[in-house]
Amino acid sequence: MAEGLERVRISASELRGILATLAPQAGSRENMKELKEARPRKDNRRPDLEIYKPGLSRLRNKPKIKEPPGSEEFKDEIVNDRDCSAVENGTQPVKDVCKELNNQEQNGPIDPENNRGQESFPRTAGQEDRSLKIIKRTKKPDLQIYQPGRRLQTVSKESASRVEEEEVLNQVEQLRVEEDECRGNVAKEEVANKPDRAEIEKSPGGGRVGAAKGEKGKRMGKGEGVRETHDDPARGRPGSAKRYSRSDKRRNRYRTRSTSSAGSNNSAEGAGLTDNGCRRRRQDRTKERPRLKKQVSVSSTDSLDEDRIDEPDGLGPRRSSERKRHLERNWSGRGEGEQKNSAKEYRGTLRVTFDAEAMNKESPMVRSARDDMDRGKPDKGLSSGGKGSEKQESKNPKQELRGRGRGILILPAHTTLSVNSAGSPESAPLGPRLLFGSGSKGSRSWGRGGTTRRLWDPNNPDQKPALKTQTPQLHFLDTDDEVSPTSWGDSRQAQASYYKFQNSDNPYYYPRTPGPASQYPYTGYNPLQYPVGPTNGVYPGPYYPGYPTPSGQYVCSPLPTSTMSPEEVEQHMRNLQQQELHRLLRVADNQELQLSNLLSRDRISPEGLEKMAQLRAELLQLYERCILLDIEFSDNQNVDQILWKNAFYQVIEKFRQLVKDPNVENPEQIRNRLLELLDEGSDFFDSLLQKLQVTYKFKLEDYMDGLAIRSKPLRKTVKYALISAQRCMICQGDIARYREQASDTANYGKARSWYLKAQHIAPKNGRPYNQLALLAVYTRRKLDAVYYYMRSLAASNPILTAKESLMSLFEETKRKAEQMEKKQHEEFDLSPDQWRKGKKSTFRHVGDDTTRLEIWIHPSHPRSSQGTESGKDSEQENGLGSLSPSDLNKRFILSFLHAHGKLFTRIGMETFPAVAEKVLKEFQVLLQHSPSPIGSTRMLQLMTINMFAVHNSQLKDCFSEECRSVIQEQAAALGLAMFSLLVRRCTCLLKESAKAQLSSPEDQDDQDDIKVSSFVPDLKELLPSVKVWSDWMLGYPDTWNPPPTSLDLPSHVAVDVWSTLADFCNILTAVNQSEVPLYKDPDDDLTLLILEEDRLLSGFVPLLAAPQDPCYVEKTSDKVIAADCKRVTVLKYFLEALCGQEEPLLAFKGGKYVSVAPVPDTMGKEMGSQEGTRLEDEEEDVVIEDFEEDSEAEGSGGEDDIRELRAKKLALARKIAEQQRRQEKIQAVLEDHSQMRQMELEIRPLFLVPDTNGFIDHLASLARLLESRKYILVVPLIVINELDGLAKGQETDHRAGGYARVVQEKARKSIEFLEQRFESRDSCLRALTSRGNELESIAFRSEDITGQLGNNDDLILSCCLHYCKDKAKDFMPASKEEPIRLLREVVLLTDDRNLRVKALTRNVPVRDIPAFLTWAQVG
């Protein structure tokens, strides 16, 4: 198909050559057609000619319509105008077209249909004469001239695909029917609008105009012919023109206007068409427009969107009479010196002429060449044309109108350099010609028929005028315009819609501001660098301090009115804005790199400081502009944090480092610089906070209530703006903190205030709590630090580094607790050695070994173990009661943090019950003080820490309601115990309030109910904490129901939680909470009631599941009493919820509430027994070495074999005894001959490790030790396995004696005892593996001991050694004369002699069970 279409292709220059030869003889189109078809084709090719378009040339062969007789009606206008050539159907006025073009110039891009009104005016003879002097110049195929501000959009396509060609042919076939109808309308209208021949004869080029009129009428009727078809005798063109080869490429045939000849193809779309004719012409052009997109050359610099702009959607009768009159006035007035008026009429708007000389305007080389040619060729133009001064006068206005334009110009790769006076200082801008006006098709729409678009002349093929001289530099702006030069942003604003897609990687895409100003016009570094900027059309100006108006291309570009839907327009604007933001960030990255290089130096010079200040100022402007342009983009890119890190944090740290450096010459100057930087940062973030509120239309005061969950959803921009505002406040707090540190002061009140404000804006963010914890660490308030670190971990976006901070805090607390305990011991004893002489605390082992001394300390002694108090509770109570409230509060805080340190680190949990007991004792004494040393806020912090301990210790991978870890149960038990003490205190205070109300005379009438207003102050301090804990219990019922295993506490400290709650419920029912009415629904005269504890704990993850129902009260009511009324209401609901549980804990019986909660131990036994019986049959693979040896000896072979084996056993025993005696003698000799140091073992029995014989022979004694609750019984797993084997016995042993059956029965009882105790989760009973791992249950007790060395005795001894952690720095004395002291908390209970010897050699205390019971005074 391409070959067939190629046969009908013809060049525009060939047509002009033929017409130039045949015009004097005959002007008929038939002769011209014959000559064209008979002309041979030449082989020389041009690299920049347009590829032949399928479907365009085929229309040339269609039959031509005859020229209507009325085609000369407009010739009288040509005589007066000298710039306009004949039009096809002269019925359409030109003035209206021009007027509408002017209107579109001010409002946006000119539609391509409006261009045709200007395309239809050919040039006069004077201009044609000048065009003959342009000759051909040598061009490079892909030469591209750089134009500032112009960016290639997409890669040009070389040719259309076969599918596209078929689609074009289908469209051409459809055009034929429509053009037939158009021909009829054209013929009728041309007859009706025939111009006066008398006026045509007055024009020197009248004959040519008529010929051109007829020819163009024929070709436009077809819609696609060769546009450059007419000849002019005055041009002197030779008869033969150059034919181009197959590979030649041509430019677009849809030209806007031509200056070459009256017969140019620019007259193809005349303004003289009737309304029907113009409408049909526009429809035809619209259907042909897709072919333009395929005429893209690789060497072209045109954007693909230039063709897209030429595709108008609605091409109806849009040329009003007003537009035609406006166009006629502007064009006809050019000959009478109205150029200046036209320039004034169109000033302030981007004006571009799309002639070749105007398109080359922005290139310095092109402009210089054009000015040289303008100076050297006016005479030649006159002599060649043979015209007089009248033509020269007509030519000058034409040049003035065409020579100037404003805007960003895009030159094709091989655009002709014009010889017109584009560079003339008196040339005025062409009024009707806008960016999308006459010639909006860009460089691709220019053909090769006009002299101003060609670098060569067929008459002078060897002459290259465009390359003779060097051109002067082009100016971007109009110098003759009477308005101020257009700024970079304005030019981009008028041009922006021309580039719909900005995805190219062309580095020339970003414009440069003409003149000496920089591309980024920052005002520099000064204290007040944020003045109010102008308005840009999308975002108001006051929010852009110190910035130029944003580029029109990005934020305020006029878009094509008919080519994009509103959604596409929005997306288009979004894409452009995203590109601007990315550009800003790229510039900021470059500035930050320079700033980092400056900061990396060891010393910074004064010039470096000034450069640093300038870079920081630019960074602040760039980052602030990004935040104010698109807050969502800024949040996704972390612009807020990058701003703080790059512009402030690294500079502050550098200055702080320099201030601390002793080698710095002038530290005071650096300190002053640091303070100035901090002051500047404070001003900047204050300003940014205000701009955020104004830009995104919100007020910070409306969101400072501290609510994490709001009833109405926030707007997306407000949500992101609040997050940015919170970060600004955190930065303000950091700046205030740095200022205090730089000034060597510790008043962090201002920083704390900023952090609290930030916390109120977004309570779910963990960063403000982390910063508040830092301040607490600086001021040595450890409870506040632990509280805020836990809040930062229990946030929706936690700060994970707080975990390490908590670990270090708890380690420090542990050291302080140990020091406090040691101090208490020293106060109790007169000297460190006095405690050794007490009869209860000293047990001296007497034996032959004089170098070994064991010091046994009874648990009742004050130094018995870590965390335990004296056995005399009354003395201890008296000791706590004698302390002042402040000292008692300090001691309680230390014990409380020590207990939670064990829960958090899970280290040292064996002493947790003792520490918890101490905490509860001190807390109980604290609550008795009035007023309470613990305020409302401090009490809320204590409850919050208890909630976090339960929340943090829950199983992460278990979602079953019944699964709770041991740590979680212990944490819940501690929290519930403190809650019960708190409730018990509230019950007492309520009774006091009732008595006070009865005694008051004004309340005699209402004696049954307790008024909320009569609450004592201490009760008002405690009610918020009780309410918060009840909220947590309602949100997480699985953590306390069924009730956790209670701690082993003394009777004076242990409190039944549920009985206490029942008593509290009974007294609470007498409280009248309706003293202030509460409402659920909002109203005009109501206000929302927010409790202080709810606001303080908002965003705390453990409380997010708690019910949060809004409550409203009257505006005139007392808010304090209303808050207490709400608390009482919530507590009543909570107590009723306890009665409504699936397994109720409270019940209403006999007119009062009672506790029906099950006993935790009993419930644990039931659950554990079921688990134990289920797994009992699985423990069949127990290996017991000693039992197998004894059973084989007793049950296999005859009596002779037994006697033989016993004899061997006795012989081996004698040998072992002899060896032991020998070793003892050797040891004695060695000890006598060596200077041996005495060893002291300080034994504080806490962990008791019995062996298998202990359970068989002394099970009752072990039970008594366990019931004493003073020791922890540790059972090695190998002992349990041995007991299992003994309890099951040997199935093949039918001759077992009575002793074996007795052993089997005792072993069975021992197993039952252990299972029962483990199932009840006895805190004083544990199982231990051979590797030292503690087990809370023995449901799974199989252990692989294949890799262990030694027998079962060695495994039992290894369990004891697990609790012997000797460190040389702890037991080695400073002098050689002092004995070595070892601390032991474990005691091995066994009667086995071999095991006792092994224990002694490893310095493990060992006793038999009866002796230990006697010493411990148990039973």
UniProtKB/Swiss-Prot annotation:
Stated consequence of mutating D1353A: Abolishes RNase activity
Swiss-Prot/TrEMBL cofactor(s): Mn(2+)
Tissue expression per record: Ubiquitous.
EC number(s) from the headed UniProt entry: 3.1.-.-
Top EC class, one word: hydrolase
Function: Component of the telomerase ribonucleoprotein (RNP) complex that is essential for the replication of chromosome termini. May have a general role in telomere regulation. Promotes in vitro the ability of TERT to elongate telomeres. Overexpression induces telomere uncapping, chromosomal end-to-end fusions (telomeric DNA persists at the fusion points) and did not perturb TRF2 telomeric localization. Binds to the single-stranded 5'-(GTGTGG)(4)GTGT-3' telomeric DNA, but not to a telomerase RNA template component (TER).
Assembly with partners or alone: May form homooligomers. Associated component of the telomerase holoenzyme complex. Interacts with TERT, independently of the telomerase RNA. Interacts with SMG1, SMG5, SMG7, UPF1, UPF2, UPF3B and the PP2A catalytic subunits. Also interacts with the exon junction complex (EJC) composed at least of CASC3, EIF4A3, MAGOH and RBM8A; required for the process of nonsense-mediated mRNA decay. Interacts with DHX34; the interaction is RNA-independent.
Protein name: Telomerase-binding protein EST1A
Organism of provenance: Homo sapiens (Human)
